[in-house]
């Protein structure tokens, strides 16, 4: 199994309040419980989205946390095939371009991929297996 993390799930984990962070941890723990060999993937777009705020705020500690994480997971590059698929997704679901790209990246990993997100809009994407991050503030 591959857990593809949407940018919002990563930002919840690294920057969110405890309730947000715990929601992501809960989803990841359930993945590991069902498949101890599960892998984690993110898109190159997700890398960019997560690094913007720490760079803008000159938060080197947070940037280092993100970069350390990204060095340990699979990065899905934005190929021409993925962009074409994202275009089709955007046309049929009305998702915003970055979300369509994220969905296409996850779908490119095959049927063993689950998309971890806090955004319910991805439910409109045909074939995308979603693991919803349910945020409960603690």
Q: What residue ranges belong to the model's regions?
A:
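Short, flexible helix/strand-to-coil boundary loops that buttress conserved ligand/catalytic motifs
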Residues: 14, 54, 90, 126-129
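Short, well-structured N-terminal submotif of metal-dependent ribonuclease cores
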Residues: 1-41, 54-65, 136-138
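Acidic, PIN/NYN-like endoribonuclease modules and their adjacent C-terminal/linker elements
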Residues: 2, 72, 103-138
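General small-molecule cofactor/ligand-binding pocket signal
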Residues: 41, 76, 131
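A generic structural signal for short hydrophobic patches within well-formed alpha-helices
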Residues: 10, 47, 122-123
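Active-site neighborhoods of divalent-metal-dependent phosphate/nucleic-acid chemistry enzymes
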Residues: 74-118
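Mobile, glycine- and charge-enriched loop segments
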Residues: 57-58, 66-87, 134-138
């Amino acid at each position: 199994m591959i857990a593809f993390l949407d940018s919002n799930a990563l930002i919840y984990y690294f920057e969110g309040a405890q309730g947000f962070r715990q929601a992501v941890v809960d989803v990841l723990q359930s993945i590991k419980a069902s498949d101890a060999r599960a892998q984690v993937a993110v898109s190159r777009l997700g890398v960019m989205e997560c690094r913007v705020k720490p760079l803008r705020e000159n938060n080197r500690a947070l940037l280092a946390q993100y970069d350390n994480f990204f060095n340990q997971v699979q990065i899905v590059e934005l190929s021409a095939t993925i962009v074409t698929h994202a275009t089709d997704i955007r046309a049929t679901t009305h998702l915003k371009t970055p979300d369509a790209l994220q969905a296409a990246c996850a779908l490119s990993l095959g049927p063993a991929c689950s998309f971890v997100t806090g955004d319910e809009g991805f439910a409109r994407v045909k074939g995308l297996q979603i693991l919803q991050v349910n945020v409960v503030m603690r």
